[in-house]
């Protein structure tokens, strides 16, 4: 009974502060914008959208523009050696980036690419990060600095 109360208290505390790793709305806004249907099912830490007829269609993260995506993962699945039954929200950046220049750096790099002197393309990457905090199996708070992307942009 005490363990149940402790879990409820922890969930309440985590839901009050979004930087602690739990957000009540587990669905990222960009995911909702990308999908025209609403029912989502969690499968081993990845979100798989479903239509009414149970036909599975995967989101095309790389087909859209660069944006922030979310996965709800068990802490153990992060692969960082922590023992915890908690789940955290891991945010990452994915999507395509236009070739057009937005900064002086991008302008020069595009020109060098055109001459064959630089390689690659602009890529979607985090522009800022957020810490993730969770309760481990020993009932100690663990904070993982800069684990999750907080914002995305095109670079390179």
Swiss-Prot record:
Gene Ontology CC terms: extracellular space
Molecular-function annotations in GO: glial cell-derived neurotrophic factor receptor binding; growth factor activity; receptor tyrosine kinase binding; signaling receptor binding
Pfam families: TGF_beta
Keyword Disulfide bond included in the entry's annotation: yes
Disrupted gene: phenotype observed: Mice show normal development and behavior, but are hypersensitive to focal cerebral ischemia or stroke.
Signal peptide: 1-21
Gene3D superfamilies: Cystine-knot cytokines
Compartment(s) where it occurs, according to its Swiss-Prot or TrEMBL record: Secreted
Keywords: Disulfide bond, Growth factor, Secreted, Signal
GO biological process, one term: glial cell-derived neurotrophic factor receptor signaling pathway
Keyword Calcium applies: no
Disulfide bridge positions per record: 66-124, 93-152, 97-154
SUPFAM superfamilies, per database record: Cystine-knot cytokines (SSF57501)
Subunit structure as annotated in this protein's UniProt entry: Homodimer; disulfide-linked. Interacts with GFRA4 coreceptor and RET: forms a 2:2:2 ternary complex composed of PSPN ligand, GFRA4 and RET receptor.
Function, in words: Growth factor that exhibits neurotrophic activity on mesencephalic dopaminergic and motor neurons. Acts by binding to its coreceptor, GFRA4, leading to autophosphorylation and activation of the RET receptor.
Family: Belongs to the TGF-beta family. GDNF subfamily.
Protein name, entry field: Persephin
Organism the protein comes from: Mus musculus
């Amino acid at each position: 009974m005490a363990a149940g109360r402790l879990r409820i208290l922890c969930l309440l505390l985590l839901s009050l502060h979004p930087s602690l790793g739990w957000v009540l709305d587990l669905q990222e806004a960009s995911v909702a914008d990308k999908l025209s249907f609403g029912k989502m099912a969690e499968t081993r830490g990845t979100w798989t959208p479903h239509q009414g007829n149970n036909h599975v269609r995967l989101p095309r993260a790389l087909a859209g523009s660069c944006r922030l995506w979310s996965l709800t993962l068990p802490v153990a699945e992060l692969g960082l050696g922590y023992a915890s039954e908690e789940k955290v929200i891991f945010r990452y950046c994915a999507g395509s980036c236009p070739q057009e220049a937005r900064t002086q750096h991008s302008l020069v790099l595009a020109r060098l690419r055109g001459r064959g002197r630089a390689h690659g393309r602009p890529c979607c990457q985090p522009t800022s990060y957020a810490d993730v905090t969770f309760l481990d199996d020993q009932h100690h708070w663990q904070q993982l600095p800069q684990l999750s992307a907080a914002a995305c942009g095109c670079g390179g």
